[in-house]
Amino acid sequence: MRGSVECTWGWGHCAPSPLLLWTLLLFAAPFGLLGEKTRQVSLEVIPNWLGPLQNLLHIRAVGTNSTLHYVWSSLGPLAVVMVATNTPHSTLSVNWSLLLSPEPDGGLMVLPKDSIQFSSALVFTRLLEFDSTNVSDTAAKPLGRPYPPYSLADFSWNNITDSLDPATLSATFQGHPMNDPTRTFANGSLAFRVQAFSRSSRPAQPPRLLHTADTCQLEVALIGASPRGNRSLFGLEVATLGQGPDCPSMQEQHSIDDEYAPAVFQLDQLLWGSLPSGFAQWRPVAYSQKPGGRESALPCQASPLHPALAYSLPQSPIVRAFFGSQNNFCAFNLTFGASTGPGYWDQHYLSWSMLLGVGFPPVDGLSPLVLGIMAVALGAPGLMLLGGGLVLLLHHKKYSEYQSIN
């Protein structure tokens, strides 16, 4: 099943200055992003001709001289493989016999191989839960006592084809534990909604991350699951591929502008290598109600990345199939909420979103509201100085024209 749409690609608000724009253009040249004005975006569920349908979603964004591939799958834990090529003709090749075997190496390829400019992956390995009862925000371990985590490799997922929406370029992976003796997910689910975009814009709901045709958005929602404590905090364990012996870098950006995400002045980024390369971008906020707003905002904390042994993590067949078995993994945790304030316990709802992309991460310019406030704040003193100068000038002129009668 497939849906496609022409989408405009451009810097838009991503360029704070002409000098920075030229710098970005020069460095983007190796990635084949020069001159990209449009991208043809398509979503396709790759069929398994050998047996039951498997959830393998391919997002393909084709430009004049480049292609971006995002391959999502719930085979094992939910994962995405990101690939950027310098040709509009690169294709995804899937060998289902290999992919579903105990040794899936080579079961997933982007061809031609020599066109690949960047590739990496994210794997959402575990759903975490902590008991924050009687824990203060100033405690040494403010998250509280951990419950046994839910391995996402042991989840049962919906048929992704049923949720594929070509009109919005979106699809949703929705799952629950296969073994749930306490029935904590009897009326609940964990959902990962993936969406590609036809142009640079913002969603209507917070945190309103600026996106382009070079990005796709992931919205994670925990809905209706029964917490194991009265004030449970939830989180996600996330694994990614290291760059050689090193882990990707985590950066924080701060702003004076919070119009798009009220009371949130920070943007977090995960960067694979030096720019331009791949990135993940999110605001450190989650929401305990739908739609999200200031009153339901929860803090989102990201732990430092650390090297992780592959055998200690739930394994993703698509990551193994594309990258092989000899890889350095790094992991970090995202946790949502605090022991005080709003939380999942309010409505048994939690949502958080991030952007994934290739190239330079979108950069927020100042919103029209903030620009207006700054113009007034900076313009008023200037007008007062100008007015004062005119008064002094006219006053001086009046006295200079006075002639003594003597």
From Swiss-Prot:
The keyword Hydrolase does not apply. GO terms for cellular component: cytosol; lysosomal membrane; lysosome; membrane; nucleus. Its main location: membrane. The keyword DNA-binding does not apply. The chain crosses the membrane at residues 373-393. A motif (Lysosomal targeting motif) lies at residues 402-406. This is Glycosylated lysosomal membrane protein. It is found in: Lysosome membrane. Highly N-glycosylated. N-glycosylation is essential for GLMP stability and for MFSD1 lysosomal localization. Residues 1-35 form the signal peptide. Keywords: Glycoprotein, Lysosome, Membrane, Signal, Transmembrane, Transmembrane helix.
